[in-house]
Structure formats: structure tokens, C-alpha cells
């Protein structure tokens, strides 16, 4: 078994909903890691978005060498859950790497913390993914964070909690009259995440890699209003 590491940069605001009921002001919360409570994209949501993207890619690329073998890599369903066939690739959750914060010296700066860096180091070590001689610097580069913009874990948790992340009001109008007003939490644009794909020994499929890294990928809800446009890069 081998692993390949990818990063996600949010070009527009991202809403991958948790699907959980919320009694607070925010109607639609984003997904969070069950242990750290930091923002994430669950593996099932990520896999679904990448599968849909690859299916669209195939429609626009007729050459066999550019087509992604979706069934082979992602698996298939035949008439119900009991007849599912697993694909060759194992998708892990996309974990938060960094989030943007306002700055007096620039429009914004990316911030992260040592705990986030260490967790990615540990995963890379577990899966045998090399990060170079200076692993911390490599991860900070992936996160687009300078050393001086690392913050404490306490502050990073604060910056990513429900009170700090952006909340956008959505309104359903009928003949100019509001019929349904709701509030959605988003992971702000410029946020960065990282995820691993586990696969058989050897390099990751070239057609798949090209499909997800050569053009933007839409992840999550509300594509019609520009949410979820992301750039994915292989590390």
C-alpha cells in the first residue's frame, strides 16, 4: 500500500455541510473533525466530489489515455448498497492546514499552529510519504504560512470556531417576498486543507492526477452561487 498527499486551496468560500441539526442561529454548519473539532472535509464527501469531477472530465476528454477509469478507482454500485464494489483508491478526510486572517500589513495572512503541522507530519510518516529534510518548512510552505504567522493551538481553535468563521445569509424569494431565510457557515476562501489517497504500490493514476490537478474542482454545496471552487495540487 502506498499513499499520495494532495493539498486543497479554496478559491471561493466552501460549504460542505455536516448534515446535523443545530438549535443555534446558524442553520447549516460545516463538517468538523470528530476529535479536534477543527474544520475538515469528510472522506465520503471528498470522494463524491472527486468522482463527480472525474465523470465530467471524461465527458470532455474523448481520448482513452486522458479518461479516468472511474469504476476501477472509485468503485461502483449495482442496484443497492449490498451490491457495492469497492474501488482501488482509499480516500482519507481532508484536514485543515491553514485559514486566512485579516492583517494590518496585508489584506490577509495565512495562519496555522504546531499541532496541525505535527498531525500532518505524523500521518505522512505513517503512510511513508516523504516531506524532505525539513518537514516543518515543507508543511508551512504547503499551508502558505510563514514562521512568524504560526499561532497557538488555542488561537487557531478560536479562529476556526463557530463564532469566528464566516456566516452567510441565504434568502429564498417569491415575487419579491422572502419565503425562507437561512444562515450557512463557510470555510473562507484561501483556506487550505490536505488529504491522502491510499493506493496500490506504484505511482498514482496519471489520468486521475491530471483530472483533479489541471483544472479547478468543485467541492461541496451551492455550486450555482460559486461556492466550493478549489485548486488541488499533488505534493
Residue ranges and their predicted role:
Residues 1-235:
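RNA-binding basic/glycine-rich loop and surface signature characteristic of RAMP-family CRISPR effectors
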